[in-house]
Amino acid sequence: MPEKLCQNCFYIVSFPLNVSLLFEKISTMMYFEKGSATTDLTPEDLKTGLYEALEKLGNRQKVLAIPPDFTRYPSHAGELTEFAWQYYGDQLTDVLPALGTHTGMTDEQITTMFGQVPKSIFRVHDWRHDVVTLGYVPGEYVAEVTEGALSFDWPAQVNKLLVEGNFDLILSIGQVVPHEVVGMANYNKNIFVGTGGQEGINKSHFIGAVYGMERMMGRANTPVRKVFNYASEHFAAHLPIVYVQTVVALNKETGKLQTYGLFIGDDFEVFDKAAGLSMQVNFEMVEKPLKKVLVWLDPSEFKSTWLGNKSVYRTRMAIADGGELIVLAPALREFGEDKEIDRLIRKYGYFGTPHTLKATNENEELQQNLSAAAHLIHGSSEGRFAITYCPGKNPENLTKEEIESVGFRWGDIDEITEKYHVPTLKEGWNVMPDGEEIFYISNPALGLWAHKDRFN
């Protein structure tokens, strides 16, 4: 087992690998695909599709699964991971949730999401210490894809388990959905961010923020994605990764979550097809700018503004100038999932791009934590509309003073819930007894909303 990685070398030259793995994957392909804007896949359908793909892959001796964490619970990645474990048994030796910078999963969350998969095979990703660098995307390429906005080298970093574990199959499992950092979530983001390191995560987030979130959300082939794809092609092609991608959205007619697609393959095509379907079912072009948007954050999933600000990202292109976003966040207890990022958010706040870029230029601690700087940009309305957070009232919740200190308004969750009859609201447009129109969203992580004036 190698002790450390040559930081300036490609991994395939720096380590004594199982050579057969390097040449096993001669061609790329789709192993399974099923999905449309009317498809409704059951858990049994997902199991059948996964098993069909695994049969095509042939015998595998040591398998690693990389699903998302509990923040992606609706993705069905938990069930698919359990199905993979049922298929491979003891040959599925490790499960590494793609935490990125998120807090590790609790035993209760693991049981809820992954069923009977043994807790003993779960590993916890440490984005600050557990990574190796496969290679560097050159600054010239970064400058090319960002239209000159940035020109630093980008490190392709992954958890060391991927390269030291001698796996002959790595299943990267997750949901493709609009995303604020990369345009559309999943595919190789699950690898380079979900199991990535501090520098790689920081710089990828900053690329997206500086290039412009609204230029990227809902697009599959963004500058950040191009950087990831470069890394996949040049530095990670030897890793036996197969992507298992779901498309899940809220069915507006039934009011229930529906699985619209399952795509399994080992190259960009699997992601591209899933992303195309996602934009059909996860995206809504609103007929007019929204003056008031009310978003509910499920307390089992959203405990920080790091995650809860999806309510800002996913609705910003739909909200009218001078409008208001009200976020009901009963479990809100922190700003960042990571303690250092939490401290930086408290110190610098969500005060817009010019303020954040100035602070970044002047403060080394932000320069060393560019994902935090990017998040501060993403989480601001740039003064265009008001953002009101309504946390719960338990001792662990963020206080009114804490909410207001970072640039948000504070709202009383009980008063807002009563005023807008929240338990009775339906998805989308609602008209209150006094004639006020509001737009309600029960889970911002599942969609993207925009008005044509702000989405080209």
Language-model-derived ranges and their functions:
Residues Y73-G89, G308-I319:
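Histidine-anchored nucleotide/phosphate-binding helix
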Residues K62-Y73, L96-G100, S172, V293-W296:
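Short glycine-rich or small-residue beta-strand-to-loop segments that form or flank ligand, phosphate
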Residues C6-C9:
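Cysteine-centered motifs
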Residues E33-K34, T38, P43-K47, E382-N456:
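Extended hydrophobic packing segments that form well-structured cores
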Residues G49-L64, Y88-G89, G165-N166, F283-K292, ...:
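Glycine-rich phosphate/diphosphate-binding loops that line cofactor/substrate pockets in enzymes
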Residues V124, R128-V286, M317:
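Conserved, well-structured core segments that form the ligand-binding/active-site neighborhood
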Residues F302-N397:
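C-terminal catalytic subdomain
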Residues D94-V142, G349-N369:
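Long, charge-dense
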